[in-house]
Amino acid sequence: MHYRFISLALGAALAVSWHHSAHAANEVSPVQFIDTFAKIFGEHKGERKGHAKGVCFIGEFQGNSKLAAYSASPLLSGEVYPMIGRFSMPGGNPHAAENSRIPRGFAAQIQLSNGDLQHFALLSTPVFGAKNPASFLGLLQASIPDSITGKPDLKKIAAYRQAHPDTQGQADYLAKQAPPASYGHAAYFGLHTFYLSNASGKQQAVRWQLQPLDGIKGLTESEIAAPPHNFLEARLRERLAKGPLKFKFELVLAAEGYPLLDPSQAWPSQSKVLDAGEFRITQSDGDQCKNINFDPNVLASGITASDDPILQIRSAAYAISFGKRLTGQ
């Protein structure tokens, strides 16, 4: 019950690690996040510090070659590229309950023919759990279990959210939406702003997202209320036995006045959306993704990261987590 509450209280926020940057609010250190995750979830040596529970997959990506007006990146050339990825549960618990009200994660590494790598790290929530690293760290610290009861202080968390309203939107979304019934029945959102450049150097701010061609489907209330159990990996294998699992890759275009650097705010529903390609997952077994850290700041040529402080702080913490994992910490 403790892990299930923490997952609901923090939602997808617990899925994200950080990269230290001069832009990071109040000079928050990525080490603080790694240490705080351990205080919440405990030490799990050799495991990822975020998204500890998950399963690898392999497949391919093909971008839409008709978007030259927006991007000259080879990612969108129309060429088919190999992909290694990972579906996951957020947080640092490798035994997280799969029927709890927490999002799913989708991460992928695409190998381009010119040698470029493109990483994606997405969640099944359209907003992040805080507007900047300092606000998010405070939420985490407010959620550390009490040393006597072993449970989080609900009043403390509620008071923090009231004082920091940017932390409430994601929690509200998770409380209202049924958890995805499978990894293939969820939409996934990149949350952060990136910039595309065309051949003339003109830039366009975008957020990316994935739409499942199998459709969106949530768990039933009885499934959510059932005792914690595992089913996501088995459902994925069963689905792939029938053929590739496909996701439509979309680019949401920013317009004037959009919050480019605050992932806790959704963009307007009437935003222009481009069909940018397709992710096709063909197999899910093995450990091909084990040594990939899926840093979302690893980008193909023609694509650049924004100054979103949460995006910018992710690389360093991903690297710290990766180093700890490889050394059995």
Locations of the language-model features?
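Bacterial N-terminal signal peptides
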Residues: 9-17
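Sec/Tat signal peptide C-region and signal peptidase I cleavage site
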Residues: 18-24
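Active-site-adjacent core segments of small-molecule enzymes
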Residues: 25-329
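Bacterial N-terminal signal peptides that target proteins for export
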Residues: 1-8
